[in-house]
């Protein structure tokens, strides 16, 4: 069975899918034909050889290749992809790069040299030097007669105040250009003539800019101790000089903007950084004060020593009172014991003597045996002084023990006082060491803060320069696109003006009554009045013979 019929759109879509998926990256070589550059910037063309023809389109061509306009007969190499234009059922090449014949060999040589020098380390990012912040002398290596040096001088006069510029004249195109530029770089470095160098040249083809792809120039830039800014060609032009230099600028004017900032902007930037630094410092100091507030009473040495001295005095007074109290208490106990012992003995002796008196008075009438007995008893009673002596001997060890106890207690309290004094002295030393440590930490934080602010300042300056460079590039590109679009619209409007046709000898015919344009003989009538407009005025005519007009028409 045969397949069902397909819609034209469905078949075209299948063909489009097959072509665009299988021919997404192609390179075509041929001759341009039917070249048409539209005011929108799109390029429509045909590319052919002796046996075939292929339509093509290059969208936004003018924004990428504004320095050269292609024409019929140019031999080119086109990079792009196949696409199908469904409304016409045609396939075409949609280009994204166009290389003129002869430039392909140079591009191949460019890529080979770039790969080799990259492997040798000539384009390494870590070897690039930073630009000076406010250069006093700016060296410019360029042609002294071109518009480039005028652009640089104009920007510097507007953006900077105190500076010197040293122009080293060289040729920027031709066989000797690379050697002259290399020699200029060597002389500038040997004599230390500038703080920063600008290598500048206007736009051109790859052949015109080839001097800046020479290996001798790349090596001279790499060996330079002075920072170099490359400003060669337009923004879309890249040379090996751009990769080897420390900074690439899209245009010579942008290079002047990069190497020299205006004094007013520098003051504003510094004031902003100063305000930020002061605000950050105040916040940091406030935070540190809050953290150190609990340690304030320890850092006040006078208050600390006063409190410690009061504590020592209180301890000493307490010790003295305690010792005196113990001594007084011991003396009272000793006196009480002595009074008790003495009072009891006297009362007993008094009673006994009275009893003896009674016994002696009765002994006169008793017998000698009783007297002897009584005498024996009297002898016994006379042994009490010996007991007193024994009691005194027994009290002597107690007195010695009491004295020893008091001395030992005093010794212990003195040692305790000495230990407390030692601990307080140790605590004072520890607090003093902590104070020194905190002071050192504060000094370290201050140094870190200073280094951090300097680093932040440098980063902010670099970011500001990058943003400014990008903004200037975007504005310049938009301005150029707007000028090109305005010129194209102006030309288109001028070409559509009907009055321009009248200048070439033509006339416009209008109906006299209705004032409408008459474009056919059929609208004419005999003896009718018509109005004719010429280049420099109008006239009223009467139709006399229509056949003649028809004969002319035929």
Swiss-Prot record:
E.C. number = 3.1.11.6
Q: What class of enzyme is it?
A: hydrolase
Q: Subcellular localization, per the record?
A: Cytoplasm
Q: What is its main location?
A: cytoplasm
Q: Which GO terms describe its cellular component?
A: cytoplasm; exodeoxyribonuclease VII complex
GO terms classed as biological process: DNA catabolic process
- Could you give a GO molecular-function term held by this entry? nucleic acid binding
Q: Which UniProt keywords apply?
A: Cytoplasm, Exonuclease, Hydrolase, Nuclease
Query: Which reactions does this protein catalyse?
Result: Exonucleolytic cleavage in either 5'- to 3'- or 3'- to 5'-direction to yield nucleoside 5'-phosphates
Q: Which CDD domains match?
A: ExoVII_LU_OBF
One Pfam family of this chain: Exonuc_VII_L
- Top-rank lineage group of the source organism: Bacteria
Annotated PANTHER family? EXODEOXYRIBONUCLEASE 7 LARGE SUBUNIT
What's its job? Bidirectionally degrades single-stranded DNA into large acid-insoluble oligonucleotides, which are then degraded further into small acid-soluble oligonucleotides.
- Give the record's subunit note: Heterooligomer composed of large and small subunits.
Q: Which family does it belong to?
A: Belongs to the XseA family.
Record-given protein name: Exodeoxyribonuclease 7 large subunit
Species: Chlamydia pneumoniae (Chlamydophila pneumoniae)
Q: Which gene encodes it?
A: xseA
């Amino acid at each position: 069975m045969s397949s069902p019929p397909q819609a034209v759109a469905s078949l075209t879509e299948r063909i489009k899918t097959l072509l665009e998926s299988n021919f997404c990256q192609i390179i075509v070589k041929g001759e341009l034909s039917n070249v048409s550059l539209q005011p929108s910037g799109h390029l429509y063309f045909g590319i052919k050889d002796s046996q075939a023809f292929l339509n093509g389109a290059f969208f936004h061509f003018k924004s990428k290749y504004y320095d050269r306009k292609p024409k019929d007969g140019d031999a080119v190499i086109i990079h792009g992809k196949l696409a199908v234009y469904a409304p016409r059922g045609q396939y075409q090449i949609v280009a994204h790069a166009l290389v003129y014949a002869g430039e392909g060999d140079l591009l191949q040589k460019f890529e080979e040299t770039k790969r080799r020098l990259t492997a040798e380390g000539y384009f390494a990012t870590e070897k690039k030097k930073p630009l000076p912040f406010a250069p006093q002398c700016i060296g410019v290596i360029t042609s002294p007669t071109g518009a480039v040096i005028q652009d640089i001088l104009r920007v510097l006069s507007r953006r900077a105040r105190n500076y010197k510029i040293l122009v080293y004249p060289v040729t920027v195109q031709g066989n000797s250009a690379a050697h002259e530029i290399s020699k200029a770089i060597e002389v500038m470095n040997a004599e230390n003539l500038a703080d920063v160098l600008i290598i500048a040249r206007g736009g051109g083809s790859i052949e015109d800019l080839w001097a800046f792809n020479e290996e001798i120039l790349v090596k001279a830039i790499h060996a330079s101790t002075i920072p170099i800014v490359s400003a060669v060609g337009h923004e879309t032009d890249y040379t090996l000089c751009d990769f080897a230099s420390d900074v690439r600028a899209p245009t010579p004017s942008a290079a002047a903007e990069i190497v020299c900032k205006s004094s007013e902007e520098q003051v504003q930037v510094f004031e902003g950084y100063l305000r930020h630094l002061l605000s950050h410092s105040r916040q940091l100091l406030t935070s540190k004060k809050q953290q150190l507030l609990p340690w304030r009473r320890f850092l006040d040495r006078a208050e600390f020593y006063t409190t410690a001295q009061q504590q020592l005095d209180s301890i000493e007074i307490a010790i003295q009172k305690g010792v005196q109290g113990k001594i007084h208490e011991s003396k009272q106990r000793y006196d009480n014991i002595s009074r008790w012992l003495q009072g009891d003995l006297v009362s007993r002796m008094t009673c006994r003597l009275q009893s003896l008196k009674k016994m002696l008075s009765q002994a006169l009438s008793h017998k000698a045996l009783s007297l002897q007995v009584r005498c024996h008893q009297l002898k016994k009673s006379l042994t009490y002084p010996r007991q007193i002596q024994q009691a005194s001997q027994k009290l002597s060890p107690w007195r010695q023990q009491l004295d020893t106890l008091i001395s030992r207690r005093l010794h212990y309290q003195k040692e305790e006082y000495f230990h407390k004094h030692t601990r307080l002295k140790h605590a004072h030393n520890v607090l003093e060491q902590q104070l020194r440590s905190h002071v050192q930490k504060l000094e370290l934080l201050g140094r870190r803060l200073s280094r951090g602010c300097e680093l932040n300042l440098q980063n902010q300056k670099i970011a500001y320069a990058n943003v400014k460079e990008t903004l200037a590039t975007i504005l310049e590109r938009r301005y150029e696109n707007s000028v090109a679009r305005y010129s194209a619209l102006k030309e288109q409007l001028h070409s559509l003006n009907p009055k321009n046709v009248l200048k070439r000898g033509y006339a416009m015919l209008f109906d006299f009554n209705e004032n409408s344009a008459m474009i056919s003989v059929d609208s004419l009538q005999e003896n009718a009045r018509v109005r004719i407009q010429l280049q420099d005025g109008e006239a009223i005519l009467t139709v006399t013979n229509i056949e003649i007009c028809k004969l002319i028409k035929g």
